[in-house]
C-alpha cells in the first residue's frame, strides 16, 4: 500500500509539472513522419497545450479533425490554436468548421493570406503585396466568420508588420487601430518583434488586451532562432506584463535549429527555459 501511495504521488507530481504549449511547426518534419510518436515526445517533454500547423485537405497531419482530437486527448494534450496559412474567404467556413471539430479555440492567420505574403529568397526577407487596408478588410471578414464558427481569430506577426510601408504606415499598428477587437486579436511572436527592433511592452501599453497568445522563442548572438532561455531576449520583463497584454496562452516555437541540435531536443531545452524564467 505504501509503495502504491508513493507511486501515485510520483505520477501526480509528474502530471503537475506539465505546463505550457508547443507550436508543432517546431517539429513539423517529425510530425510528417510519425505524428503519434512525435506528440508523445511533446507530452513527455512537459508540454500540455499544442498549436497545429499541419492542416491540408480537411485533415490535421493526415487525420480527420475528430481523430486528431481523440489522439491529443489520449496523450493528455490540449488543442488551443491552429495556424491556417491557406485560408481564403471561400474556404474559411470549412476550415473553421474543421478547427472547431478538432477542439481548437483560436484560428490563427500566420501570414497575410490569399496571395498577399511575399518572401525574397535572395535576401531572406518577408513582406506583402497589396495594401494594409485590403488586409484589414480580409481579416475583418474572416473574424466575422470565426465568430459564427465559435472560434476566435488571431493574426500572427513576423518582423515586416512593424516597419513602415511605402505609405508610411506601420501595418501592425493599422490593424490594431482599425479592426474591431471583437473580430480580431493578435498572436505576438516575441522573436520577430525583437528582430524588428520593436518593444513588446510598449505595444502592450498602447494596445492592452489585444495579444491573446504569444510565440516564445529566443535569439542567439547571431540573430538566429534559439531554444528559450539560451539567448538574449529578456522574457522576464515581458512576462511581468502578461496581464496587460491580454495573454491567455503561450506557445514555444523554434522555426529552425542549428549546429546539429534536433527539434525534439530543442523543445526539451526550451521547456526547462520557460520553467526557469517563470512561465506557468
Model-found features: residue ranges?
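The substrate-binding groove and active-site-proximal loops of carbohydrate-active enzymes
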Residues: 81-86, 125-132, 191, 226-229
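Bacterial N-terminal signal peptides
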Residues: 1-10
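Histidine-acidic metal/acid-base catalytic patches
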Residues: 16-26, 30-45, 172, 176-188, ...
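N-terminal pre-domain/capping segments
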Residues: 11-106, 112-113, 272-275, 279-280
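A short helix->loop->beta-strand "cap" motif at the edges of active sites that frequently abuts
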Residues: 77, 104-105, 151, 244-248
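Active-site acidic/histidine proton-transfer and metal-coordination neighborhood
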Residues: 49, 89-185, 264
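Active-site-proximal loop/turn and secondary-structure-junction residues that shape catalytic pockets
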Residues: 26-28, 54-56, 85-88, 113-115, ...
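Conserved beta-strand positions in the central sheet of alpha/beta enzyme cores
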Residues: 51, 81-83, 108, 154, ...
Amino acid at each position: 500500500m505504501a509503495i502504491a501511495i508513493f507511486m501515485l504521488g510520483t505520477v501526480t507530481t509528474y502530471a503537475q509539472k506539465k505546463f505550457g504549449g508547443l507550436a508543432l511547426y517546431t517539429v513539423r518534419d517529425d510530425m510528417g513522419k510519425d505524428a503519434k510518436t512525435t506528440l508523445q515526445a511533446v507530452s513527455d517533454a512537459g508540454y500540455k497545450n499544442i498549436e497545429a500547423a499541419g492542416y491540408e485537405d480537411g485533415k490535421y497531419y493526415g487525420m480527420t479533425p475528430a481523430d486528431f482530437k481523440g489522439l491529443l486527448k489520449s496523450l493528455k494534450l490540449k488543442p488551443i490554436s491552429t495556424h491556417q496559412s491557406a485560408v481564403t474567404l471561400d474556404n474559411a467556413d470549412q476550415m473553421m468548421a474543421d478547427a472547431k471539430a478538432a477542439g481548437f479555440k483560436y484560428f490563427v492567420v500566420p501570414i497575410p493570406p490569399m496571395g498577399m505574403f511575399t518572401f525574397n529568397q535572395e535576401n531572406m526577407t518577408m513582406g506583402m503585396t497589396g495594401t494594409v487596408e485590403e488586409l484589414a478588410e480580409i481579416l475583418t471578414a474572416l473574424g466575422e466568420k470565426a465568430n459564427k464558427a465559435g472560434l476566435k481569430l488571431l493574426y500572427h506577426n513576423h518582423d515586416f508588420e512593424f516597419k513602415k510601408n511605402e505609405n508610411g504606415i506601420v501595418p501592425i499598428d493599422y490593424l490594431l487601430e482599425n479592426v474591431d477587437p471583437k473580430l480580431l486579436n493578435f498572436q505576438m511572436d516575441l522573436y520577430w518583434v525583437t528582430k524588428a527592433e520593436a518593444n513588446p511592452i510598449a505595444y502592450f501599453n498602447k494596445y492592452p488586451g489585444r495579444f491573446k497568445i504569444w510565440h516564445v522563442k529566443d535569439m542567439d548572438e547571431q540573430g538566429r532562432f534559439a531554444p528559450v532561455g539560451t539567448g538574449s531576449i529578456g522574457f522576464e520583463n515581458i512576462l511581468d506584463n502578461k496581464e496587460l497584454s491580454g495573454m491567455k496562452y503561450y506557445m514555444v516555437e523554434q522555426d529552425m535549429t542549428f549546429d546539429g541540435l534536433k527539434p525534439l531536443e530543442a523543445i526539451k531545452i526550451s521547456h526547462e527555459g520557460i520553467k526557469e524564467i517563470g512561465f506557468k
